[in-house]
Amino acid sequence: MISVMAPGSEKTGKVETILKKRVLLAISGGVDSSVAALLLKEEGYEVAGVTMCLGVREEENKVRCCGREAIEDARGVCEILGIPHYVLDYAPLLETCVIDKFVREYRLGRTPNPCIDCNRYLKFGHLLDSARTMGFDYLATGHYAKIERKESRWILKKAKDLVKDQTYFLYPIPVAALEHILFPLADRTKDEVREIARQALLPIAEKPESQDLCFVTQDSYRDFLQEQGCPVHPGPIVDRSGRVLGEHSGTVFYTIGQRHGLGISSPFPLYVVAIDVAGNSVIVSGKEDVYAQGLVAGEMNWLTPERPQEAEARIRHRKRTCSCRIVPEGDRIRVYFAEDQDAVTPGQAVVLYQEDEVLGGGVIEEALHYAN
């Protein structure tokens, strides 16, 4: 039996005594998850790697994670580290849990965040269930985030590397699941992680980060949406008075706050401020109309037993947080910003923080403007 500091325990003082505690690590073949595996092994855990196969056709293997090349990279790292490697076929789950919603949201004129849904349903839903079924004590990933013990409960916090912090994408983790999840990179920076990979002579040490949607193998998401049957009908681009200024190529190709690619001549910059799917029109206006005083959010997931009245809100990944007031409305909330926020986009997430702790989050349904 060996004693090791549980990840984050240097902050909580918790020492975990483990008898080869078993960890299933989601490994994509990238540097983050590979170093996470190495760190867990060095800490004394019994580690196995698992890669989700998302069903990309080999002749179209342009995917940056979870494709054939990624699976081979993950397998190679596991061999170097001397740990088992599993591949689970998650293609049907990806289709029903992520892609179907992705397409449906665009049909409704919203801009979804499929990475959040992947975390919600696949990684910290089905994969966590699989880990427990397979006899593992924990599921670990290479996310930059931190889980700590606070009094009698587990909390989700921002990572040490605030530039790489991924808590915006992790708010849907069920609160009861936090105690079964490990984030080995919680107190590492990206530069430190790459250096660890170099020192360990891992072949993926210089591998670039994935940027694209993992399930879009075409040159652009536009092609993907058309393949999925999204209606693409040209229509008018209008100002708030209804005056036609130009023509759009399909409402699914536009998002709130978009400025470029409108094809409109104007003496001042114009931005997309609304998408009218029923009328097949895109509404544009000046920069001042991009700002909102608040939002309505649904599909809430709370990670704290108390419902806060004030918090810091983040409406996009890497956008700075702003102070806000929270008003509950049944299973939804209204969020009122201390400072107006630009491009509040239905379909994206709003995540609520108290200092470094994630309080919860939800899906933006509506932006609130002064005229409402």
From Swiss-Prot:
Organism domain of life: Bacteria
CDD domains: MnmA_TRMU-like
EC code: 2.8.1.13
Region Interaction with tRNA, residue ranges: 164-166
Disulphide linkage map: 118-214
GO molecular function, one term: ATP binding
Presence of keyword Glycosyltransferase: no
Annotated positions for site Interaction with tRNA: 143, 348
Compartments in which it is found: Cytoplasm
One of the Pfam families matching this protein, by short name: tRNA_Me_trans_M
Record's GO cellular component terms: cytoplasm
GO BP annotation list: tRNA wobble position uridine thiolation
Catalytic activity: S-sulfanyl-L-cysteinyl-[protein] + uridine(34) in tRNA + AH2 + ATP = 2-thiouridine(34) in tRNA + L-cysteinyl-[protein] + A + AMP + diphosphate + H(+)
Coiled coil: none
Keyword annotations: ATP-binding, Cytoplasm, Disulfide bond, Nucleotide-binding, RNA-binding, Transferase, tRNA processing, tRNA-binding
Residues that hold ATP according to the record: 26-33, 52, 142
Residues at the active site: 118, 214
Alphabetized PANTHER family for the sequence: MITOCHONDRIAL TRNA-SPECIFIC 2-THIOURIDYLASE 1, TRNA 5-METHYLAMINOMETHYL-2-THIOURIDYLATE -METHYLTRANSFERASE
Task of the protein: Catalyzes the 2-thiolation of uridine at the wobble position (U34) of tRNA, leading to the formation of s(2)U34.
Similarity comment text for this entry: Belongs to the MnmA/TRMU family.
Protein name (database record): tRNA-specific 2-thiouridylase MnmA 1
The species this protein was found in: Syntrophus aciditrophicus (strain SB)
